[in-house]
UniProtKB/Swiss-Prot annotation:
Enzyme class: transferase
Modified residues (2-(S-cysteinyl)pyruvic acid O-phosphothioketal): 126
Residue numbers binding UDP-N-acetyl-alpha-D-glucosamine: 102, 316, 338
Biological process annotations from GO: cell division; cell wall organization; peptidoglycan biosynthetic process; regulation of cell shape; UDP-N-acetylgalactosamine biosynthetic process
The protein, known as: UDP-N-acetylglucosamine 1-carboxyvinyltransferase
Pathway named in the protein's UniProt entry: Cell wall biogenesis; peptidoglycan biosynthesis
GO molecular function: UDP-N-acetylglucosamine 1-carboxyvinyltransferase activity
InterPro entries according to UniProt: Enolpyruvate_Tfrase_dom (IPR001986), Enolpyruvate_Tfrase_sf (IPR036968), MurA_subfamily (IPR050068), RNA3'P_cycl/enolpyr_Trfase_a/b (IPR013792), UDP_GlcNAc_COvinyl_MurA (IPR005750)
Gene3D superfamilies: Enolpyruvate transferase domain
Gene that produces this protein: murA
Enzyme active site: 126 (proton donor)
Source organism per UniProt: Anaplasma marginale (strain St. Maries)
Enzyme Commission number, as recorded: 2.5.1.7
Catalytically driven reaction(s): phosphoenolpyruvate + UDP-N-acetyl-alpha-D-glucosamine = UDP-N-acetyl-3-O-(1-carboxyvinyl)-alpha-D-glucosamine + phosphate
Length: 428
């Protein structure tokens, strides 16, 4: 990935305008991985054009799949992709690909099911603490796979079809639920997954698999039941919209006292984010083609957030809320219960004048009157979005290095913000 920086000129201009919500990255990637299971061509609409999507495309191509991308150049969002995996000839994914994206681990189950073996280098992506694959491996072993970790590779094999079983996760894991689900849809017999993740993106994957011919019940609940089928065929499917992207643009508006019309999403899609946005002083209004988020109160209100699996507050949004809380009238607290070491952005916000302190899994943020521009470095995807929000509301110029991480989750973000009045420039 080419290194890039963002130059943000903070100003009194509020972020105001219309943005079309993109398809959800956290739905697109597992659905692309699931295409490895299918016969025939699959047409996916609502696809975001992101770095992680590009890497997943390269991964599928390296296995023998074919991918064509039809871009929506007008909106720079919600593109179409056609994927055909009829002629897979490889089961090993090298470190050069997996090191770029954690979601590469989601191909373990599909490759194993399709090819009888899989060899995937340990994944990369954002460095936000320990996110081991133990639960993924355990679930595949329960289904009858032989799994071993050799150096930096996970090697899986099966002597025949996987066999349905009861998988009872000790803790909720989105990725492990998705891997187990994809491995089970063509296993012999019935599989029950207890304590399954219920994120909308997991449900979207399940609905896609049902369209392809899978037999899955309990979608959207903590218990999934899967009756294995002989084969799956490629359907057409539209990716759900990205609640994390929408929430990020909403916070940019609240931080700057603006108003954004986000087309394609609803307050229902935002879930608990809508409630927290209003708690900070925002107003969330559903309109016929989406929703409008504006700053309702003259000041930003402090928040107390506890991250948790869905339907709780998403860990992927805590950094952006922290950036907005830097200007709140009062003290905010953010408690991170999903990942460890996810407050690496705190020292960067402090360079901009934020009064933020981290102890263990809690960040305390005492609001200040103003932030000032500074040179900062984005440690990961969501932190880069947080620093951008802070830069938009700061006085002076903020330069965000390592900003290429932003494009793992946000498509053409600087262009969309410029259309809403921001002064943002991408420098490569």
């Amino acid at each position: 990935m080419v290194e890039a920086s963002l130059r943000v000129s903070g100003s009194t201009n509020p972020i105001s305008g219309r943005i079309v919500a993109n398809g959800a990255k956290n739905s697109a990637l597992p659905i692309m991985a699931a295409c490895l299971l299918l016969n025939g061509s699959v047409v996916l609409a609502g696809m975001p054009d992101l770095r992680d999507v590009t890497v997943m495309s390269e991964l599928i191509t390296s296995l023998g799949g074919r991918i064509s991308f039809l871009r929506n150049t007008k909106e720079k969002a919600n593109h179409k992709v056609e994927i055909n995996c009829d002629n897979l000839h490889n089961w090993a994914i090298p470190h050069e690909i997996t090191s770029q994206m954690r979601a590469s681990c989601l191909t373990l189950g599909p490759i194993l099911t399709r090819m009888g073996r899989a060899e995937v280098a340990l994944p990369g992506g954002c460095s936000i603490g320990s996110r081991p694959l133990d639960m993924h491996i355990w679930a595949l072993q329960k289904l009858g796979a032989k799994v071993e970790v050799c150096g930096n590779y996970v090697k899986c094999s099966s002597s025949g079809k996987l066999v349905g079983c009861h998988i009872d996760f000790q803790s909720v894991s989105v990725g492990a639920t998705e891997n187990a689900l994809m491995a089970a849809v063509m296993a012999h017999g019935t599989t029950t997954i207890s304590n399954a993740a219920i994120e909308p993106e997991v449900a979207d994957l399940a609905h896609f698999l049902v369209k392809a011919g899978a037999q899955i019940s309990g979608i959207g609940t903590r218990t999934l039941q899967i009756c294995g089928v002989q084969q799956l065929s490629g359907p057409s499917h539209t990716i759900i919209r990205d609640r994390m992207e929408a929430g990020t643009y909403a916070l940019a508006a609240i931080s700057t006292g603006g108003s954004v019309h986000i087309a394609g999403v609803t307050s229902e899609i935002l879930g608990c984010l809508a409630h927290e946005l209003e708690g900070m002083g925002g107003k969330v209004t559903d309109v016929p083609d989406g929703l409008v988020v504006s700053r309702h109160s003259p000041q930003i209100n402090p928040v107390v957030l506890h991250t948790a699996p869905y339907p709780g507050f998403p860990s992927d949004m805590q950094a952006q809320f922290a950036a907005t809380a830097c200007l709140a009238r009062g003290t905010s607290q953010i408690h991170e219960h999903v990942f460890d070491r996810r407050f690496s952005y705190a020292r960067e916000l402090a360079k901009m004048g934020a009064d933020i302190h981290v102890q263990g899994n809690t960040a305390s943020i005492r609001g200040v009157d103003k932030l000032h521009g500074a040179s900062v470095q984005a440690p990961d995807l969501r932190a880069s979005a947080a620093l951008l929000i802070a830069g938009l509301s700061a006085q002076g110029v903020t330069t965000i290095s390592n900003a290429q991480t932003l494009y793992r989750g946000y498509e053409a973000m600087e262009e969309k913000l410029r259309a809403c009045g921001a002064e943002v420039e991408l420098v490569r």
